[in-house]
Amino acid sequence: MAGSKEIRSKIKSVENTRKITKAMEMVAASKMRKAQERMRMARPYAEKIRNVTAHLSHANSEYKHPFVVKREKVGNVGLIVVSSDKGLCGGLNTNVLRLSINQMKAWEGEGKKTIVSAIGNKGFTYLNRINADVKSHVTGLGDTPHLEKLIGTIKVMLDAYIAGEIDQLHICYTRFLNTMKQEAVIEQVLPLSDDKLETSATTAKGHWDYIYEPDANVVIDELMTRYIETIIYHAVTENMASEQSARMVAMKAASDNAKNVIGELKLVYNKARQAAITKEISEIVGGAAAV
């Protein structure tokens, strides 16, 4: 059995670790609430631009934007992988990367090559390590991701789609369900599904008649790009909320485990102390008997 001094040292070490994990839990909880608020504030804009884009597309049915045209043959596929820049968030990044790799293998089995864009340092590092075809990446988004930082890497993938380098674009991220539950998902971004546009177009009754300046097609082109940027930005904000939730849960579990370890070490310490006292008493009694 370890000595009392050694056990006291272990208890102090675990207590210090628990203080750190408890502080990280509280910080993550605060950041999670802010991330949820950003998600809530972004929804009205995303919904409005989706509705306007759908209305314009249906009002100008003779013009088909490349983003809504399905290609007969799908060769290369684009995949945007959203991960975190930091760790200590449970299995969040592991789940996203596992899902991405499995999907890439499935596409490979169908004869499709995957071109990847990485958002977040953890995903970028891993994808480079497995020699994935990473066409663009962005890291260092911080706790408050801004669309301006994402536009560059989004544009690379959109240009690749327009140029025919990829025939589909998907995004893999962690969807925020609630504080205790997050889910890694893959969603198709391009081509835009008819269901999304049809649903948005039918939400408003009557005919929408727009006056365009300078030209209807130019307006639609610009709105389509903004709409795709909004979809990807929304996925990033959901991933951020999921990251902070997962980190809060992970740090709470670590704090609880540390508390249990401290309790067990204190029991061991008390037993060691009791054994030492019993030994001393036995020696004293034995010495007295000898006299």
Curated annotation (Swiss-Prot):
Q: In terms of domain of life, where is this protein from?
A: Bacteria
Name-wise, this protein is: ATP synthase gamma chain
**What Gene Ontology terms for biological process does this UniProt record contain?**
proton motive force-driven plasma membrane ATP synthesis
Provide the Gene Ontology terms for cellular component: plasma membrane; proton-transporting ATP synthase complex
The reply to whether Protein transport figures as a keyword in the UniProt entry is: no
Gene expressing this chain: atpG
User: What's its membrane topology?
Assistant: Peripheral membrane protein
Where does the UniProt annotation locate this protein? Cell inner membrane
Q: Which GO terms describe its molecular function?
A: ATP binding; proton-transporting ATP synthase activity, rotational mechanism
Coarse class of the primary localization is: membrane
Q: Which family does it belong to?
A: Belongs to the ATPase gamma chain family.
The species is Methylobacillus flagellatus (strain ATCC 51484 / DSM 6875 / VKM B-1610 / KT)
